[in-house]
Amino acid sequence: MSGKITDFFEKKTTTTIDEAENKDNDKELTSTTTTTTTTSTTSKKKVAAAPKKKAAVASKKRKHESSDEETDKEEQQNDDDDDGEEKVENNNNNKKLKNEEKSEEINSTITDNNYYDDIENYFTDKQWKEALSGEFGKAYFKKMITQLNKRYSSKEKPIYPPKNEIFSAFNYAHLEDVKVVIIGQDPYHGKGQAHGLSFSVKKGVSPPPSLINIYKELETDIEGFKRPLKNGFLEPWARQGVFLLNAVLTVEEATPNSHKDFGWADFTDAVLKILSKQDQPIVFILWGGFAQKKEKLFTNKNHLVLKSGHPSPLSIKHFIGCKHFSKSNEFLKSKGIEEIDWKITE
């Protein structure tokens, strides 16, 4: 822009000088036709006046050049100011972007940790919550819960049981009131079945094959037991101190053992170790090879360990006749502990 202004003033100045010189030449011709003396006098005046006119023109030109320089400086200053403002704006934008990114990161962390925070609400029993507080803070547990939170949130494939029922087994009886522990492998993977208790299904859901076989064994083992045909809800056992624990507490729909590598085994092993250290006598019932691998965790001689095949139809012949229910009651009675009423009504 400054270059255009300078060109304009230079052209204007040149035009002014040319016009002044043309006027002087016209006057000079007019004076010559009058008289020689006048011509001489006029010529002298012109000679004397010419330097003044040229000086005035030069001065005017210098003013224009000075004005151009000031204009250039002003424009440069404006450009510098614009650059400065742009830098400030860029810095502000960068800060804003960083703050937004940090906010997103915090929000993401909060989102990931929501499930972990909710666990405080899922554990309603204070004794269990206190006993397991050390596990909640471990890296494997936080990683597992974060992973589970994403799986539950994505809804690509249903996860069972619902989040608020994962720890149901811990909320039916205080740690000090546990009498019998029955270890399962992982939850039922059919819709509407699992609710946090091993081998149990929700109200209104027909008993699965393994539970039907458990009922069959009870019919031959416990006098007066009548097998319910439509009720597989084992809550009455849980309320009496039967701890129905799966080694893995979650599963994807129609995909058994899908969460076996999530870290649940570390958690439930810690649970079993805590139970093993309890002074009150406990019966540990281990059905099948998977559950029997946990036997090494029970080093307390106060407890009783019972083993047999799994109640699944695939291994039923190694399960039927084990009499684990009557044996559990005999042990509890011998220790002065109230026996379990194994009855399940329709």
From Swiss-Prot:
Residues 20-29 have a biased composition (Basic and acidic residues). Residues 67-86 have a biased composition (Acidic residues). Pfam families: UDG. InterPro entries: UDG_fam1, Ura-DNA_Glyclase_AS, Uracil-DNA_glycosylase-like, Uracil-DNA_glycosylase-like_sf. One of its GO terms (cellular component) is nucleus. Its EC number is 3.2.2.27. SUPFAM superfamilies: Uracil-DNA glycosylase-like. This is Uracil-DNA glycosylase. It comes from Dictyostelium discoideum (Social amoeba). The gene is uglA.
